[in-house]
């Protein structure tokens, strides 16, 4: 990529339940400006930005008087759409990445194929329904929405862990790190689409 990144995108999405605006720069430095009204979720999105080096601005207003579900899911949808738009043809990307990430008592693996084909494999179990006031089931809901709309195949496997906060946070950090690697420009094929099909449109 040139010094001035062209892999940027902004998406605004409004429904009767939420109003969300997202901007991303895939060639950023991990700067973030995130306000969703859900404190724990903000913290997780900050980890996603910081460790992927994707600059993110996420402004979300949702029906939090009901619960956090619509805000979390719709943020995943909008963020995924922004990433897909910024990727364009997905020309020159590394495409694949995987790793195991340690966080204190917890070990979580993530693998990604930025293929244009949307899929989530989720092997993560929480031992409590909530982290503070945040429903732990919403972690999966976010990644499901994000993967489907970014057009990526994403596998997340928690191998072990005792602390539910660490389990949740390790999923965001592991996904961040594989996104960082897979979205990098491959210096050996800067202008090529990394597929024998000649397309990564699904």
UniProtKB/Swiss-Prot annotation:
Keyword set includes Amino-acid biosynthesis: yes
Cytoplasm among keywords: yes
Family recorded in the similarity comment: Belongs to the imidazoleglycerol-phosphate dehydratase family.
Pfam families in the record: IGPD
Subcellular localization(s) per the UniProt record: Cytoplasm
GO cellular component assignments: cytoplasm
Catalytic function, reaction form: D-erythro-1-(imidazol-4-yl)glycerol 3-phosphate = 3-(imidazol-4-yl)-2-oxopropyl phosphate + H2O
Keywords from the UniProt entry: Amino-acid biosynthesis, Cytoplasm, Histidine biosynthesis, Lyase
Alphabetized InterPro entries for the sequence: IGPD_sf, ImidazoleglycerolP_deHydtase, ImidazoleglycerP_deHydtase_CS, Ribosomal_Su5_D2-typ_SF
Record-level Gene Ontology MF annotations: imidazoleglycerol-phosphate dehydratase activity
Enzyme class: lyase
EC number(s) given by UniProt: 4.2.1.19
Name of the coding gene: hisB
Pathway assigned in UniProt: Amino-acid biosynthesis; L-histidine biosynthesis; L-histidine from 5-phospho-alpha-D-ribose 1-diphosphate: step 6/9
Main location: cytoplasm
Listed name of the protein: Imidazoleglycerol-phosphate dehydratase
GO biological process: L-histidine biosynthetic process
PROSITE patterns named among the record's database cross-references: IGP_DEHYDRATASE_1 (PS00954), IGP_DEHYDRATASE_2 (PS00955)
């Amino acid at each position: 990529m040139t010094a001035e990144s062209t892999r940027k995108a902004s998406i605004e999405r409004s429904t009767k339940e939420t109003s969300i605006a997202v901007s991303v720069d895939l060639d950023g430095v991990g700067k973030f400006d995130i306000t969703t009204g859900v404190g724990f979720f903000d913290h997780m999105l900050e980890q996603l930005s910081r460790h992927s080096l994707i600059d993110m601005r996420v402004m979300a207003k949702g029906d939090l008087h009901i619960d956090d579900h619509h805000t979390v899911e719709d943020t995943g949808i909008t963020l995924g759409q922004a990433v897909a738009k910024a990727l364009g043809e997905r020309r020159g990307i590394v495409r694949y990445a995987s790793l195991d990430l340690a966080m204190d008592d917890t070990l979580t693996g993530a693998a990604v194929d930025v293929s244009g084909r949307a899929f989530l494999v989720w092997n993560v179990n929480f031992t409590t329904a909530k982290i503070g006031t945040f429903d732990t089931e919403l972690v999966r809901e976010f990644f499901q929405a994000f993967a489907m709309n970014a057009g990526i195949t994403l596998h997340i496997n928690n191998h072990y862990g005792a602390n539910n906060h660490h389990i949740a946070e390790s999923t965001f950090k592991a996904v961040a790190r594989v996104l960082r690697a897979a979205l990098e420009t491959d210096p050996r094929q800067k202008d090529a689409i990394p597929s024998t099909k000649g397309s990564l449109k699904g």
